[in-house]
Amino acid sequence: MTSRFGQLTYTSFDAVGTVGGWQVKETTDALTSEETQLMLAGVRTVFRTVEPMPDYPTPEQLEAAPRRLAYSRVGETYAALWHTVPAGADSTGRPGNVFAHVLLDRTPDVAPRHRAIQWWRSPHWLCPYGATSVSRAALAEPGPEPGGVVTKDSVVAFALDTTTWRLATLFGLLDAVAAALDGGAPVVLGVESPDNAAQWIGLLSFLMSPGTAAQLSFSTFDRADQLNLHGGQVLSAVPLEDLSAVPAGMAAISEAETLSLGELGGEPHRTAGGYAIDVTPWSAMAQVVLLDPGSARRLLDDIDAVAEQVRDSGLHPAWPMAMAVAGRAEFADAEEEAHEVIAAHSPPGVAVGSAAARTISGVLSAVVGTTTADAWRAVQELPTGPGAVFADTTYLCRAVADDAWLSNSGPIPLGPRMFHGKPIPPPLRTAIGDALNPARGPERLLQVADLLVRAGVEDPRIRTTLVEDVVPRLRDAEARERVGADARLTLGAVLLNDGDANGTAIDDGLLDWLADTAPLPPPDELAQATPWDRTWTTAALRGVRAWRRGTGGAGRDAGALLWWLRMAGSADFEQTATASAWNPEDLLLAIGADPLPGAAAVRTLVAAADSPALNRLAAKVIDENGDSLAVACAAVRTIEPTVWLQQRYVETHQHAYVPLWDEVLSVVDPADVHPDFSTRLLAFALLGLFTGHPYPRACSGFAASDRLGGEAIERLMPLVGEGHLAPHAVVAISLLRAAAPPDPSHPDVTLDELAGHLAEQVATGMVGDDNDVEGVVAVMAQLSGDSAEPALRGYRKMVTKLMARRRDSPSLTARLRGGMQA
């Protein structure tokens, strides 16, 4: 069985059969490699004393020499102590050797629990000096046990020493350490000796519980240049001489200089160096309880007794002292601060009937007072914890029964903590039963329900009361007028939020009244809503009403209809979205942050006009949707011809998309295809024609429209002007296609005619001299593969005729079919 403690020594030595130098000298208790590495990570191999050690120190000098004890939690579950002493010269004669003796606690949270500083000057620490002593030093079993130098008696005597006033320093140190334990600046204490440092650390440790002290990482001796702001050490002691060199960002306190005390809720403490330390109830209580040795010593025992009554893990450092102070007449001047700490920081799980539980209960009862306003004040002031839960519960118990509180204008206030997913405390369960008495009337019952629902209370009696006692009375128009918007939304949320997605408990008239409470929220707002909050419920009520009216009668709530089908998990959502073309805003509202399923967006992508909402929809489909039809249509709506050509999508994507575009256009009624889609697709088709890549045959119908054809040409002309489409090539391809005999298998005459119109516009921008003519002829010869003189003469004739008549004829194709044969 592995023992609780493991030991390791580390130093520079030269043993037989080993390479000399810094190395692990010895280990015990079957240390694993992981444990060894954790222990080695905290070893310091430099120990620079303020005064140099004598070459040949006497035993008395060695005993009085500085030593370093450091403590920290390591790994996930371990704690370790590093005891380091100067060791003189090593076996090679090199001065400055150090001997580190490390103790690993494998189960630091298991009894018996000691404060780590109690190991200070334990007689079991190995402290060899000189190469011979280092070589002979050997670990003993068991490992070091707590010593008798730092005890409750010693720290009380140290704090209340009549020859040296230390309490002011202690009060500032308490608050600085409390802040550091909570993630604030690490604390550096300037001391006359490591022995003083040990007593300061002991005093701090005994004024908190053993479990909290286990989180107080410390060192009794460091030099300023060894301090690490982000090293995780809470408290470091340094020689007084080093205090001025402490890195910025650390709370530096000197035991030899006067600390100016502040006031709780007022001015902070200030060190001699000007560092400000916020005053906490911990130091305020300490100023009362640490005035005489007898009461101070009893306080330390009381702190441990309190800690034993609870789970001593994560306790606030001031809480055990506050519990010890509460109810003690001799500490009456600290009672207010003690109650503040107990209310704010009491832990969960305190045993019912224990002395600690009785103290906490008494304090919390005082904090919440006797009125609803008193409880509301406590809700606002208390931080999260059992005290806050008590205040929250008390406030709701009083609020639901307080007619005057419920009659205030506006929503009844709620604190920062809710009851969502939590069991209802028994006192609140009883209060709810009384508050839902039908005799209070529908308006008051609805106010109670609104408050409870917004607080996250889940109680079936709320819905039962609304259905049986409130809804029937809301058929009266006068009764409805007295119900505010928040209460209306709460009523709707409760009636729908019971697995009744169709709202069967709500008749059409009541549903109209509820749904008209607020306008439909925009998609971005609805995407951030949480189920059954105000925004979400508004959309739900409008969605249910639209569902009842059907797709044709949904009107402006069509998006809410789709959204509600999705929220309710309806199998009809995808089918409904796919079957019709929607306003893009409605689809975006319906889908929120989720991907659109399948081909749900296809008809909308084909049938909707260009708009920012359509752009967002198309981009969402491309980014998140795996349906090929939807992605192909989204590409048409969001990618401009220039990008399509420059990014070579015409080469990499168009071949795959052409059959998809044809498939979509074969099932969508031509009358439903929006001109914006037709024009964009027609531009892609022309790019395919001019670059030798496929294009959708369905575009022939679009090309027959003068309007669509003209707009498609306008989209491509900038590509010619910027040189992305070579002008000579455009004219050459157009002339060759116009002159080719008709191909029955590819009856795309209208697209060829449109290409001819584009060529006419391109030719209009040419100079029309021999260079242009010969340039086009050369491209025609290259494309046709026929550079014989008869062919060149024919091409030249076609180009010349085009240049001569380019501004006149509206039909290039019809004109040139006969020209080639002439």
UniProtKB/Swiss-Prot annotation:
Signal peptide: none
Any one Pfam family match given in the protein's UniProt record, by short name: GAP1-M
Spans through the membrane: none
Outcome of gene disruption: Loss of DNA conjugation when disrupted in recipient strain, no effect when disrupted in donor strain. The recipient strain secretes reduced amounts of EsxB.
Summary of the function given for this chain in its UniProt record: May be involved in assembly of the ESX-1 / type VII specialized secretion system (T7SS), which exports several proteins including EsxA and EsxB. Involved in DNA conjugation in recipient (MKD8) but not donor (mc(2)155) strain.
Miscellaneous note of the record: DNA conjugation in M.smegmatis is unidirectional with distinct donor and recipient strains; mc(2)155 is a donor strain while MKD8 is a recipient strain. Mutations in a donor strain that alter DNA transfer do not always alter DNA transfer in a recipient strain.
Name of the protein in its database record: Putative ESX-1 scaffolding and assembly protein SaeB
